[in-house]
Amino acid sequence: MADPRAHIVVHALTLAYGDRVVLTDLDFSVKRGQVFIVMGPSGCGKSTVLRNLIGLDEPAKGDVFYGDVNFTRAAAGEREAILRRVGVLYQSGALWSSMTLAENVGFPLEEYTDLTRDEIRDVASLKLALVGLEGFEDYYPAEISGGMQKRAGLARAIALDPEALLLDEPSAGLDPVSSRLLDDLILQLRDSLGATIVVVTHELASIFTIGDDSIFLDGETRTAIAGGSPKELLAHSTDARVRRFLTRGAEGDPGGRADG
């Protein structure tokens, strides 16, 4: 029986690009209101999982469910309805350089609501304030720091009050202080919005700070080889690959706060 607390369920998923299989036999579920980490070394397919969760890529086999709805097999209209309740932060932040921050955040509201221009501006200002960017409405992305760009991207991701947030390497390229502030913000959004948050990352500090549950992907075997609370995996996993990844900072590998 499916876990009634599950918000997102991945069942028997195989991901491939043409004949090249990236990952096979993925099974995991994300409970409502938790921060779920998709982790593993670079190149193991973490971002590919995220792309399949929102339909940018289609799985070779298997299914993705949002609640009781099979997203993988849903018709286009049903998919669109699901995705309107999902906010996404891409690794680059994906802000439009020709738009102000308020215009960037307001874009989904223009596309999917009947709000007036003034109402959209008010909502955009509120979302920017939620991520610590009050007063930056009329700045352009090039005029703010990388950490502020990530926060602006988060503001846009929550513009439609999503039930779920999917974040692709949110701390990539940030200095340790900015990364820590972003982690704090992610937890604040989880608590204030009650959102389910899936984070693709290999940043150890973030993994241990924000992760309620996780899955560990292994590029060599092309599947998930561990799952559970990151702190519990650190304490109890006997798999050498998992332990090497989770202790690499302590062993002198500069992996605690890496770029990319």
Listing of model-derived features with the role each one plays in the protein:
Residues 54:
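Helix-to-loop junction immediately C-terminal to a conserved catalytic motif
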Residues 159-163:
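A short, proline-enriched helix->beta-strand linker immediately N-terminal to the Walker B motif
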Residues 70, 117-136:
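Conserved ABC ATPase "signature" region
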